[in-house]
Amino acid sequence: MGQAPSSTAESNGRELDLRLWSPVIVAGGESMAVGNVVDRDFTGDLPDECLAHVFQFLGAGDRKRCSLVCKRWLLVDGQSRHRLSLDAKDEISSFLTSMFNRFDSVTKLALRCDRKSVSLSDEALAMISVRCLNLTRVKLRGCREITDLGMEDFAKNCKNLKKLSVGSCNFGAKGVNAMLEHCKLLEELSVKRLRGIHEAAELIHLPDDASSSSLRSICLKELVNGQVFEPLLATTRTLKTLKIIRCLGDWDKVLQMIANGKSSLSEIHLERLQVSDIGLSAISKCSNVETLHIVKTPECSNFGLIYVAERCKLLRKLHIDGWRTNRIGDEGLLSVAKHCLNLQELVLIGVNATHMSLAAIASNCEKLERLALCGSGTIGDTEIACIARKCGALRKFCIKGCPVSDRGIEALAVGCPNLVKLKVKKCKVVTGEIGDWLREQRRTLVVSMDGDETEAVVVVDGEVETVVEEPRVAQAGGIVAEIGSSNGGGGSRLAMIRSKLGFLAGRNLVTCTFRRWSHNDNASSST
C-alpha cells in the first residue's frame, strides 16, 4: 500500500525537472526521452556572442582548456580573444600566420623575450602589424632584434594605437619618432631601458605637421640620455601625467622648458633623479598640478617645496621621500599646510616632521583622508595624539618605523571618527596588546600590525618583491584580507642598474599600500 502513488509522483517530478532545465520547449504535450536529454548538447543553442561572453569570465588556463572542447568553441575563443601575450622568441615567426588566422580580433598585444633568447625580427613585427590592424595597446619587452626600421613599419600599419610600452629594446629615437608621426591617437607612452637612446641620438619630438597631439601620459624610466625627450615634453599641450624615474643626468633644465610652455600637467612623479630646487621652482609654474611625488631627490629642500606649495594650490596628493637627508622638514610642510587646503593624501617617508608642522596640516587641511608617516625619528606619541584630535576626515592612517608607543595608539580610540583602516608597522615600542584593545574599542576599524602578517617572496618583471598577506578579524568575526608589497633586493639586472645610478641607489621604501589607497579612492577624491 502506498507504493503506486509514490512511483507516479516520482515520475512526474522527474519529467517536471526535465522541462525546467531543458531549453527546448516541448509543444503539444510531446514527451522527451531521458536518453535523448542526456545526449543533447545544450550549449549548441547558445549564440556565439553568449558563449564568448562566458569565456570572458574564465581564467587563462580554463579558457585554453575550453577552446579544446570542440571546433566551435575553438573558433569562438579565437574570434573573441582581444588580449594576447606571446613569448616573442625568433622561433615563433613561422607560426605567426596561423596564429593570427585564429586570433583575428586582438586589440591588446604583449611581446616578451627573455635575455638569453633571440627575439623576433623586424619582418615578424611587420607581419603582426599587417594582421592586427586594430591594435590599441602594445607592450614590447626584451625585443632586442627590433630596429628603428621595424618600428617605423609597425607604426605605419597600427594607426589606431593608443598605448605603447617598450622596455629593454635596442631601437632608438628614430623608432620612437616614427610612432609619434604615424600613431596620431597615441595617448600613453612608457619607455624603460631603451638602449638605442644615447648621447648622439636625435631629439624626440612631435612631427612638424602635427596640429594637435593625443598624448596624455609619458613615463620615462632608467634611461641613460632621457633628456632627448625634452622637445616632446615641452611642446605636448595635452600632457597630463609625467613620470621620470631613475633616469641619469640633470633634469632641472627639462623641467624649466616644460614650465615655460603652456603646460596642462596635473600629475608629476620624480623619483631618484638629479633634480634640485630649481626644478621644483619650475614645477610650481604648473598651477594645475594635483598629484606630486618627490621621491629620493637629495638636492631638493624646503625652499623648493615652498615654491610648489605657494603656487600649486590645487594639490590633492603629495608624496615626499626625504631619504633621511633632513633637507625637507617643518618649514616646507608649514607652507603646505598654509596654501594646500585641498590636500587629501599625504605620504612622508624619511622626513623629520614634528608636532609643529603636523598640527598645522591637521588643522588647515580639513579634507585630508589618507596619511602615511614612515621612517621618521621625530614622530612620536605627541604627534599621533595631535593627529587624532584634529584630523576629523582621516580615513586611512599608516605609521611605519616611527618611535611611537602604545600611548600614541591609544589616542586613536577616541580621535579620527571617520578612520576605517590603521596600519602600524616596525614601531618597536608598540605591542600587540594595544592592537587587540583598539579593535575592541572600535569594532568597525581594521587594524593591521606586525604580528598579523605572513610574507612570501615572488618575482615580478624580474624584480624580487615581498607580498604581505594580512588576515585580520574585523567586526562580527569577519575576515579582512589585504595585500601589500615592497621592493626587495632584486636580481643581477636590478643590481647592475643601481650600480650605474650611483648616488641614486638605495632601497625603495614606498610600499604598494599607499599606491593602493590612492587608486581605490581616486574616484571619490575627484568628485
Curated annotation (Swiss-Prot):
Q: Where in the cell is it found?
A: Nucleus
Q: Does the keyword Nucleus apply?
A: yes
One matching Pfam family, short form? F-box-like
- SUPFAM superfamilies in alphabetical order: F-box domain (SSF81383), RNI-like (SSF52047)
**What GO molecular-function term can you cite, just one?**
ubiquitin-protein transferase activity
Q: Name one GO cellular component term.
A: cytoplasm
Determine the domain of life of the protein's source.
Answer: Eukaryota
Assembly and oligomerization: Part of a SCF (ASK-cullin-F-box) protein ligase complex. Interacts with SKP1A/ASK1, SKP1B/ASK2 and ASK11.
Protein name (database record): F-box protein SKIP2
Q: Which organism is it from?
A: Arabidopsis thaliana (Mouse-ear cress)
Q: What is the lineage of its organism?
A: Eukaryota, Viridiplantae, Streptophyta, Embryophyta, Tracheophyta
Q: Which gene encodes it?
A: SKIP2
